[in-house]
């Protein structure tokens, strides 16, 4: 069966979402001292909390290295004598960012409101929507498959809100595995909930934490093709995949089964999502380096826009 679903191009990627999906700067002083009160809320003037704040609010860590936010898990975790809810992310993700020249900041799920989302995005120069458990199928109008993970509505809502805010700002975005699915669903797409039912094999997820390496082929003329060439062997661990493609997105890679392995938004803004796990191949930093370079450009544009 050909899974490379018809792409939608010409839709508005920033259109209002379905209601069910809504859900200090360094001045040379001590970077750990309390910020000036005027920096505490980018929406204190009653403006749009999702628009970029004044550039002087954008990077508490300085402008030399771009700040990249990575979404994270919020799960019950055992460590030492503790068995508690905790936010976490495998170290490979933020090592990819730091090795590529960025500063990584983790963004565990929290209650969503426009002010909190705006405050977070004001501190970032790029966003990574990371891998994790399956999206709630209700987000794309389906009932759950027996193999679909128990929903994490808090993480879903948090990532949808961050992603939509980042897209509105023109902020660079990289999606990884689940992050590809978040991007697709946020723009109106749907998912195959369990690939083995369609393909007749489990080659995309071997199980027990073992990553499968699969060849993918890129689409000529896409950003991804410019970055990695015509093909690559990539580490995969997913049992779900893109079905109908979200509005404005183009398919930039497929595998030998026709499964969509990458999506991107055309245009000047870096918005790229891969179904595989580049953090598991840190000897190849091309995707992370491209994101960090785009984040540096975003930071520079914000700095140039600052009133003199």
Swiss-Prot record:
- Cross-link (Isoglutamyl lysine isopeptide (Lys-Gln) (interchain with Q-Cter in protein Pup)) at residue(s): 289
Q: Which residues form the Glutamine amidotransferase type-1 domain?
A: 78-301
The broad enzyme category this protein falls into is: transferase
Where does the record place the catalytic residues?
177, 277, 279
Where along the chain is composition biased (Low complexity)? 13-24, 31-42, 49-61
Q: Which GO terms describe its molecular function?
A: gamma-glutamyl-gamma-aminobutyrate hydrolase activity; transferase activity
> Any idea which UniProt keywords this protein has?
Glutamine amidotransferase, Isopeptide bond, Transferase, Ubl conjugation
Q: Which Pfam families match?
A: Peptidase_C26
Q: Does the keyword Zinc-finger apply?
A: no
Q: What is its EC number?
A: 2.4.2.-
What's a single GO BP term from this record? polyamine catabolic process
User: Which intervals of the chain are annotated as region Disordered?
Assistant: 1-62
Q: Which PANTHER family match?
A: GLUTAMINE AMIDOTRANSFERASE PB2B2.05-RELATED
Please report the name of this protein according to its UniProt entry: Putative glutamine amidotransferase Rv2859c
Organism from which the protein derives: Mycobacterium tuberculosis (strain ATCC 25618 / H37Rv)
């Amino acid at each position: 069966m050909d899974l490379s679903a018809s792409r939608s191009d010409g839709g508005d990627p920033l259109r209002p979402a379905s209601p069910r999906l809504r859900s200090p700067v360094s001045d040379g002083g001590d970077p750990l001292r309390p910020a000036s009160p005027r920096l505490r809320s980018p929406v204190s003037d009653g403006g749009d909390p999702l628009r970029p704040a004044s550039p002087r609010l954008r990077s508490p860590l300085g402008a030399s290295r771009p700040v990249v936010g990575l979404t994270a898990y919020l799960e019950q975790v055992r460590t030492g004598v503790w068995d508690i809810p905790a936010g976490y992310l495998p170290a490979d993700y933020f090592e990819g960012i730091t090795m590529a020249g960025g500063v990584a900041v983790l963004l565990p799920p929290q209650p969503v409101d426009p002010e909190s989302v705006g405050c977070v995005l004001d501190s970032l120069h790029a966003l990574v929507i990371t891998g994790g458990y399956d999206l709630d199928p209700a987000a794309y109008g389906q009932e759950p498959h027996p193999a679909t993970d128990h929903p994490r509505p808090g993480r879903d809502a948090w990532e949808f809100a961050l992603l939509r805010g980042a897209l509105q700002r023109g902020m660079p975005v990289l999606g990884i595995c689940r992050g590809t699915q978040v991007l697709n669903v946020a723009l109106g797409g749907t998912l195959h909930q369990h690939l083995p039912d369609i393909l007749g094999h489990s080659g995309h997820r071997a199980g027990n934490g073992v990553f499968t390496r699969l060849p993918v082929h890129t689409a000529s003329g896409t950003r991804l093709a410019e970055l990695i060439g015509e093909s690559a062997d990539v580490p995969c661990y997913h049992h779900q995949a893109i079905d109908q493609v979200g509005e404005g997105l183009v398919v930039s890679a497929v595998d030998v089964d026709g499964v969509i392995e990458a999506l991107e938004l055309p245009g000047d803004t870096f918005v790229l999502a891969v179904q595989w796990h580049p953090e598991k191949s840190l000897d190849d930093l091309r995707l992370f380096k491209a994101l960090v370079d785009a984040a540096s450009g975003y930071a520079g544009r914000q700095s140039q826009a600052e009133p003199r």
